[in-house]
Each structure stands twice: as structure tokens, then as C-alpha cells.
Amino acid sequence: MNRKHISSGSDFESKIGYSRAVVDGEYVFVSGTTGYNYETMTISNDPVEQAEQCFKNIEKVLIQAGSCIDNIVRIHYIYPNKLDFEPCWPVFKKYLINAKPAATMFVAGLLDEAMKLEIEVTARLNA
């Protein structure tokens, strides 16, 4: 079975030994993704804006892997503050209306207090 590792180029990946995404078999597994905007090197303080940026970041790596947003089959949402979850629902619906993946929401601390959420996905490769 072929395995392909996709890197964002972050030093953090090599420091702790992980990949931005891994393609294995017919699936791509995307690591937890935050709302950090890598073009501006900033992160919004608004959880809804961060959710939008999370999906932009996820979409970029899925395309690199040979997949797309509509192929997401599993999604995990991680929120430090559970009250930030519901305001993001319109963003989730916008991106996931076709995929309708299995979903779980966790409440847990994140690496940086500026991070209002993190999203991890599993998707099928394009047919």
C-alpha cells in the first residue's frame, strides 16, 4: 500500500514528527487545522472567521492530496470554549452541505489561546 506524506513546510512538523496530511489507500487524513492565515501570517480573534480560514486551509491540503471538501467523510471539531461552536454552524453548512460527514465536537484546550477552534478531517480521494 502506498503512503504519501504532505508537509506544510512548518518546522513544527519535523520537531514533533507529524505530517500536515497523510494519503494512505483511498483516504487522506488531515491533521488538526487552525484558523491561522498563512498568507498574512495572522489569526483572527473571531471564531467564525477562524472557522472560515480553517476550511480554506483544509481545502488547500485536500487538493494537494487529490481530494476535495465534498469528499470529507469524518470531521472532528475541537473548541476550548463550547459557546463558540454554534455561531460557526453557518460556515460548516456552507462547506459541508454536500459531504455531510460523520462529526464529533470536543471541548479541549489548544496550543495557543488565540486559537478558537481546530478541525481535523478524513476524506476519500477523488475517484
Language-model features: locations:
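N-terminal presequence-like segments and the immediate start of the first folded domain
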Residues: 1-56, 60-73, 79-127
